[in-house]
From Swiss-Prot:
Organism per entry: Clostridium perfringens (strain ATCC 13124 / DSM 756 / JCM 1290 / NCIMB 6125 / NCTC 8237 / Type A)
Name the record gives this protein: Ribose import ATP-binding protein RbsA
Keywords: ATP-binding, Cell membrane, Membrane, Nucleotide-binding, Repeat, Sugar transport, Translocase, Transport
Region forming the signal peptide: none
Record localization: Cell membrane
Family: Belongs to the ABC transporter superfamily. Ribose importer (TC 3.A.1.2.1) family.
Amino acid sequence: MGERTPMLKMVGVSKSFPGVKALDNVSLMAYGGEVTALMGENGAGKSTLMKILSGVYKKDEGKIFIEGREVEVKGIKSAEEAGITIIHQELSVLNNLTVSENIFLGNEKHSKFTGRINKKLLDERSKMFLEQIGCDIDPNRLVSTLNVGEKQMIEIAKALTKNARIIIMDEPTTALTDVETENLFKVIENLRKKGIAIIYISHRMEEIFKICHRVEVLRDGKYAGSAEIKDIDNDKLIAMMVGRTIEDQFPYRDVKKGDLALEVKNLSCKEGVKGASFTLRKGEILGIAGLMGSGRTELAKTIFGEYKKTSGEISLNGSPININCISDAINNGICYLSEDRKKEGCILGMSVGENMTLCNLKKYENKFKSLDKKEEAKDIEYYIKKINIKTPNKEQFIKNLSGGNQQKVILAKWLMLSPEVLIIDEPTRGIDVGAKKEIYELLNELKASGKAIIMISSDLPEVLGISDRIMVMSEGRISGELNRDEANQESIMKLAVGINN
């Protein structure tokens, strides 16, 4: 019997952004009537590859074949015309429209006589497509009255109206209940039986082994391999995903740990943290690892007072503290560097100096309640030299600096407050290799001076290379903790996907 033709074949796909090669000669195959898992760590290139397939990005190189015929995907419309649809993690339904209006949005059926939208025909055809996926929702219902699982069914029905042959599902169960998840799996089975190729992106291992037939793995923007699900297990799949060693680029410094600085007990928040408990000592870097949506940033923002805790206690230097807002955290010596420095870490339209002293202006007030510009300038120049911020002068707009230097300015802003606990989220995201090493050296210096540091990172080599201890989160909970000498990428990934035995 001859070799079967895949529904989808992507060959030699590459994509670069300024300073970053996101995809390098990547290939992928998916077969009709099968569910293909697309796996990889955060930043492996999964989203970029799917955005190319669905027409959001244009590839730099490579070819795309559907049922053996080469197609050129020039945009979202041409992808849909080729039978490719993506259902994003963030659903794109419009709450103020009805079910049928959402299903046929942009593809409305008009009356031959009046030219108006034929509402009756929309409802009839919507009902037909919903029945095809075993869904009994009234086409006249407002989408605002539906739960997340039902809204997802609307997206799938919408894909069917476009004659989708390839449906990409990006983390489809993230916001679903167990019952809604089981319903989704039944719908996926119905789609599979129709000969549709499903590309399924998820970090939940149990789902991959339950509903997928094959797995394609990306690693660091490159093709890492593929396998039949029946031929692999958890360990083999994780090894495919992480398969790289720690490099000598991480200048770890072993420092004697001091007294207990921070203690968190049973901390929860409605944004997604569930009963987190941990400790942090002076002179220590605690790395927090986990997949996207695991609750790492939410934990940091709860400690920092940006999110309100629903339960739990926070103690500093052995004494309980109350943190109800960000200023409470800052006044207690806790500072947080956001993962999104341009949106939350700095004000792009202000200068380097203005950003640096923004949180510490009271220090420079004189007896006339105006700023002592001379004293302020002295501190700004000190930190520019101390942490090697490359800027022509303190008046330079921060938006004109490189990512690494922007990060240093934000770090200086908090160091001016002499914090006891520094939480730094994705410290080297979007930063070049040279600047990364400088950031690591800065963190080591702060650790050596007795600062207690929490470092959240999606870069596993970074977590392993810099941290003294590593805490792993999964679905809002702390799934485990590893000492530096026992941790490796596979042990972290097992905890990150909820395998803690």
